[in-house]
Each structure stands twice: as structure tokens, then as C-alpha cells.
From Swiss-Prot:
Active site annotation, chain numbering: K96 (schiff-base intermediate with dxp)
UniProt keyword annotations, A-Z: Cytoplasm, Plasmid, Schiff base, Thiamine biosynthesis, Transferase
Name the record gives this protein: Thiazole synthase
Subunit structure and binding partners: Homotetramer. Forms heterodimers with either ThiH or ThiS.
GO CC terms of this entry: cytoplasm
Primary location: cytoplasm
Gene that specifies this protein: thiG
Family matches, as InterPro entries: Aldolase_TIM (IPR013785), Thiazole_synthase_ThiG (IPR033983), ThiG (IPR008867)
Enzyme type, top EC level: transferase
Family per similarity comment: Belongs to the ThiG family.
Amino acid sequence: MPLFYETEVRSRLLLGTARYPSPAVLAEAVRRSGTDIVTVSLRRETAGGRQGGAFFELIRELGVRVLPNTAGCHSVSEAVLTARMAREVFGTDWIKLEVIGHQDTLQPDVFGLVEGARILTGEGFQVFPYTTDDLVVAERLLEAGCQVLMPWCAPIGSAMGPQNVQGLRAMRAEFPDVPLIVDAGIGRPSHATTVMELGYDAVLLNTAVAGAADPAAMAEAFTKAIDAGHAAHGAGMLEPRDMAVPSTPVIGKAVFS
């Protein structure tokens, strides 16, 4: 089972809670997915209001662990402030740290990310950093105190699937003992299977489920795909070959001359 900051979870799917058609649809998707962890974006305008209160009550009723995030933050100071507020609201040291560096692609500001991680780990936070597949940045995040890495496979919400499989493979090889969660860009269950076959520990999804015609059914499909990819990696898959290899034995085969 995956282990994140000494916390063991059963499911390898982390599910976002934004953009669902209704709270009821969200609740059913969470249940069908079997997830242990949901991500929540803290907003000042709803945290203390009636809408925010009802949403947080729904999350509590689902009995899942909350991973607050700093989505939408474009500076270190904004991300750190949001993280501190989230700790007060949710009573957890977990934080998914996002520092956005580019408005159109929502690419992480990796320099701000490392700085923010250093500040927050110094304050006792357990940081889940949304990052790229750059190995140097990953090393800096680990040096800053992170014990989990969350590389993207494509821009947030793009549904493009893994754009740099070799980069993701290299990260897994470079950090074999670090929990790795693919975050952002997954669009189909087959995408999730692909990254799990590389040996990743988990996948974080939101748009691919929330935007589906049937979010609850899609959540269940992703769970099955993730489990299949994980099982395939553990079973030991064949490596691609350049040439054909006969799969049918030739012993006892008739020879015509």
C-alpha cells in the first residue's frame, strides 16, 4: 500500500473535488472511486460562508482524508498564506503546494515551488509539491524537506496524457524510494494505466472525472485502470523488441519438403 508521510492509504487514486455538476455527483464519484484522499482548494470567500461550510461538511461525511491545495497561487507569499489558512480550517499538516508560473499552461514556477517548500516544511507542513519531471528540481524539492513528489504528465486540465514518458521513467529510476504521484494532464483511464506501468505510486485526477458524462462511472473506471497498471508493473512486463519472436512452439510441427 502507498505510504505518504508515514500514512498508509489503500487506494492509489487521489481525487480532486472541483467542477462536478453537483455535490451529490461528487459524493457518488468519491464513493465509487474508493479513494482515501481528496484534494480541496481553499478559497477565502467560501471558507467561512454557508456554501463553503456545506461543502466541507460533505467532505467530512464521506470519511476521506483531505489534502488541501494552493491552486491558483502565483507567488510564494500567496501560496504560503493559503497553506497556513488551510491548516487552520482543515486541521492537517498536509498541503499540496502549487505555485503557478505561467497563466496559459499553468506550468509550475519551480523556483518559487522550492522556496515555498522550504518555508512550509520549516513550519511543520508535509508538502506534496506539484512539479515538472525535471530531475534537478526534484532533487531540490527533496533537499527542501519534501518526502513526496508530484510531477505533471501534461498541463492541468488538458487531458493530453503523458507527454514525456521517458522523463517520467527517468524520475522513477532516479528516485526509487520516493513516493511519486502523477498529477495533472490525465484524460483517460488508459493514460493512468500507462504511468502506473512505469512504477508510479499513485495518480491524482480531477477534470477527467468531473468532466465526464458519468463522473461516478468514470471514477470507478480510473480505479480499475490504476490497479491494472500497478499490477502489471509488479508482474514484470515484457520489454519491446525490434524483431518478431514466434509465440507458437515449432516442436512436433510437420515439415514439408
